[in-house]
């Protein structure tokens, strides 16, 4: 079996989203914003938004890797239930997205009267994405 196409697909799934995330950081630097030392609410919001985006990129990459692994194991016959497992993973991810959104909307509402509301929501999104990424890596041994 030729593994080169699978390797290239896997590399594409990982590298393209990471390149986009790196471009965001370069954009902040070009704007003169140092996310390690923010000086305004606007800068803080931009930086926390970037962190949430980075976490989301990593989560999406990990999710695609899990699906790809299930598809490959189903195709080569090493896992007789991987087709069904992939469908269940898709449904679980959709349900998780709804949970995350509702949870982070609640965090935003709780902080709605202050200037930290956007940052609080972005922090919530980041934390959820990081937790889900860890779960997928653990569950699917990625």
Protein language model regions, located:
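Bacterial N-terminal signal peptides that target proteins for export
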Residues: 1-11
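Short, leucine/isoleucine-rich alpha-helical interaction segments at C-terminal helix-coil junctions
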Residues: 11-14, 139
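Hydrophobic h-region of N-terminal signal peptides that target proteins for export
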Residues: 13-21
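N-terminal alpha-helical modules
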Residues: 22-142
């Amino acid at each position: 079996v030729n593994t080169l196409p699978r390797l290239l697909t896997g590399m594409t799934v990982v590298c393209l989203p990471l390149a986009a995330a790196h471009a965001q950081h370069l954009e902040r630097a070009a704007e003169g914003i140092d996310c390690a030392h923010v000086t305004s609410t606007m800068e803080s919001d931009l930086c926390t938004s970037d962190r949430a985006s980075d976490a989301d990129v990593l989560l999406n990459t990990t999710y695609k890797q899990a699906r790809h692994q299930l598809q490959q194991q189903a195709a080569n016959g090493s896992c007789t239930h991987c087709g069904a497992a992939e469908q269940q993973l898709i449904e679980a991810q959709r349900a998780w997205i709804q949970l995350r959104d509702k949870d982070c909307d609640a965090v935003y509402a709780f902080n709605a009267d202050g200037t930290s509301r956007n940052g609080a929501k972005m922090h919530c999104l980041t934390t959820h994405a990081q937790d889900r990424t860890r779960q997928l890596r653990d569950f699917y041994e990625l």
